[in-house]
């Protein structure tokens, strides 16, 4: 890089080209810079802790909410685990809650369940979301099914060609300000090919993504499942080390080495913990999640963003500091949604209310 190139980078930053997009979680945005161009992110968790839900909320729903119609966002989603219909239903569930304050789960939207059919009153709300979804489909493209490294890279390149031109030495985007995300959920389901085992396939895929990232400004988000079984008994003796660590990443370490940002989703109640970093998590009825920043090349490492998580509508909200919480009852689940319980109880304690900002 020449001095002139460096000076240009500074000028582009002053023009706002390096500003991150919203993730719906202000503290996390401050820690990692939000969603930025040319940044590879690894997000992992053990099974059932909410890794896919976190990605759907912070890397898809939140930026869609902010950039749905300005043509500054493009999302390519490789769904190796979930079906496209269920992904869209989860996004719609969050949208309906944010817009109409109505709780309709993804399973309800799709009438999933024994003898369950979506009732007319909820169906009317679902129909109100169709116009929003029509706009979503213009920004978000979902590919579901079985993929190997070569197929994932081929589709990624085809999508990038729609957004710019590849020359012999560089990539010329149609809009330099546009952020293009590729989400792979989860990469552990990638299919081995060409004589490679699964580790080799993941390594091949992520190594090629690094090259594409450097050339095009693509921001890959890689979702992985961790292997908590690697934690030995010595680690279990110290509760601080019960949190996920980079060493827990399943299959391969190459992904972590290639990533600028590594996040881990953790539910301390899975480890039978009643308290966590000062929070009375047992009082929250399985609604507490910690998003751990294990690696960030542009900010702090080894810090936690402690969140309230309502799986019914896939809503994530950052918690106040533990010393600012005087009543945990508001965080418990109700018959509809635990978020409703937060709102209903906000007027009970003005001292607490003044310190809470859920941005609903």
Which positions does each model-derived feature cover?
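Flexible beta-alpha connector loops of hexameric P-loop NTPases
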Residues: 17, 141, 191-203, 234-243
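The Walker A/P-loop phosphate-binding site
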Residues: 1-100, 128-130, 356-360
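Cytosolic-facing regulatory segments adjacent to core modules
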Residues: 30, 66-177, 306, 340, ...
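Helical hairpin unit composed of two closely spaced alpha helices linked by a short loop
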Residues: 76, 172-212
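Structural recognition of the conserved hydrophobic beta-strand(s) that form the central parallel beta-sheet
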Residues: 77, 183-184, 218-225
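Signature of the SF2 helicase/ATPase Hel1-core->accessory helical subdomain module
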Residues: 189, 225-230
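Structural motif
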Residues: 42, 180-185, 221, 263
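C-terminal regions of RecA-like/P-loop NTPase motor modules
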Residues: 3-5, 97-103, 131-134, 150, ...
């Amino acid at each position: 890089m020449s001095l002139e190139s460096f000076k240009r980078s500074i000028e582009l930053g002053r023009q706002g080209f390096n500003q991150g997009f919203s993730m719906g979680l202000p503290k996390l945005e401050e820690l990692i810079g939000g969603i930025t161009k040319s940044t590879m992110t690894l997000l992992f968790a053990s099974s059932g802790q909410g890794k896919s839900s976190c990605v759907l909320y912070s890397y898809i729903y939140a930026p869609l909410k902010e950039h749905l119609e300005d043509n500054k966002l493009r999302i390519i989603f490789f769904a190796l685990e979930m079906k496209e219909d269920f992904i869209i239903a989860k996004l719609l569930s969050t949208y309906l809650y944010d817009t109409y304050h109505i709780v309709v789960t993804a399973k309800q939207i799709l009438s999933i369940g024994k003898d369950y059919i979506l009732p007319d009153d909820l169906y009317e709300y679902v129909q109100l979301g169709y116009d929003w979804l029509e706009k979503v489909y213009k920004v978000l493209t979902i590919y579901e099914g079985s993929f190997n490294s070569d197929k994932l890279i081929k589709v990624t390149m085809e999508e990038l060609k729609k957004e710019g031109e590849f020359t012999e030495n560089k990539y010329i985007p149609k809009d330099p300000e546009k952020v293009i995300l590729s989400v792979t959920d989860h990469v552990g389901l990638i299919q081995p090919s060409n004589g490679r085992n699964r580790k080799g396939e993941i390594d091949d895929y992520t190594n090629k993504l690094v090259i594409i990232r450097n050339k095009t400004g693509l921001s890959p988000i890689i979702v992985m499942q961790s292997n908590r079984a690697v934690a030995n008994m010595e680690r279990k003796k110290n509760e601080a080390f019960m949190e996920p660590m980079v060493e827990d990443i399943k299959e391969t370490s190459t992904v972590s080495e290639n990533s600028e940002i590594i996040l881990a989703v953790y539910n301390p109640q899975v480890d039978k913990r009643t308290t966590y970093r000062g929070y009375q998590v047992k009082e929250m009825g399985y609604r507490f999640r910690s998003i751990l920043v294990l690696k960030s090349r542009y900010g702090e490492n080894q810090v936690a963003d402690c969140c309230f998580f309502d799986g019914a509508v896939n809503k994530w909200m950052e918690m106040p500091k533990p010393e600012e919480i005087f009543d945990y009852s508001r965080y418990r689940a109700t018959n509809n949604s635990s978020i409703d319980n937060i709102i209903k109880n906000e007027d009970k304690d003005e001292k607490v209310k003044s310190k809470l900002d859920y941005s609903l």
